[in-house]
Amino acid sequence: WAYDTLRPLLMRAGDLTPMEKAERRVLVMANPGHGLEKMQASAAIYLGMQLLLPGEWAPSHRHTPNAVRMIVEGEGAWTTVDGEKCPMARGDLILTPTGLWHEHGHDGDQPVVWLDVLDLPIVYFMEASYVLPGERQAVKASRGDRAWSRAGVVPSPVFARSDKRNPVLRYPWAEARAALLGLAADQPELDAVQVTYVNPETGEDAENILGFYALMLRPGQTLRLPARSPAQVFHLIEGRVQAQIVDRTFTLAEADTCCAPGYEAVTLTNLHPDAPSFVFIADESPLHRKLGVYETR
């Protein structure tokens, strides 16, 4: 899905569907291999590109599918999740996990766009999908991305540790990018410069059905990812990358997205000879591991 193709459609949707008609404005990225009517990118992954215009506000709701937001464009918007107000900046990852109230608004002056990634297909298949409307949330002063901002150091007031399933709801891109650059500099022999978004209290995946990662390709690097059982999604945050998947080759510009089926190797090439490229990846690994079907070939 080329962002240059999606963006004009999103802006047109903004003209045609004000908030009075639809409180959330999304273009679903449906994989024709699964049937367009199913509106899914893989067996367990739903993708959508959502637009928020200046001054808009979408009321609070909660739902059973887990979701994340990878911010694609713009600034000045925010998402409030469980009372925590999360600023939205390009490349940030924001969680809206199962059962948590969330709403969003825009105080800036330019359109804001993000990529929605949900485990909706599997939750819908289990006949467990629903959504409930809610009231506007009171905003808390605390923020998880500040309290859990250093690796290996966690809050423990009077020796008590957090038992929240999602202690961190916002993963700033500035920090993930710095971690990748630091890892690349510290381990120049490392082929796959990659980090995983995790719960800092447990080390487990940030959400319990889908996994989320950031990958850095060194200048001019070609990296072969092994064939694994889970399907996966690649979204380019920065740079220019060629993705070879089975017999198809995609050239990804910034904000472009593509999918790879399970059990297929993927080769990624950074087309920039003098600068790194950065890729956001979502996959079904946590689900496959829990079901005992995870496999690398």
PLM regions and their residue ranges:
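C-terminal functional regions that serve as terminal interaction/effector modules
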Residues: 1-4, 201-206, 212, 219, ...
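Double-stranded beta-helix
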Residues: 107-169, 271-297
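A short beta-loop-beta micro-motif enriched in histidine and acidic residues
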Residues: 35-46, 53-68, 83, 202-211, ...
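Conserved metal-binding segment of the jelly-roll/cupin
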Residues: 81, 87-109, 114-119, 245, ...
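Short, flexible loop/turn elements at secondary-structure junctions
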Residues: 31-33, 51-56, 64, 72-73, ...
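A short beta-strand-loop-beta hairpin characteristic of the jelly-roll/cupin
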Residues: 53, 57-90, 96-100, 105, ...
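A short, N-terminal "cap"/entry segment at the start of jelly-roll beta-barrel domains
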Residues: 1-43, 132, 139-209, 213, ...
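Short beta-strand micro-motifs in enzyme catalytic cores
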Residues: 46, 113, 193, 211-213, ...
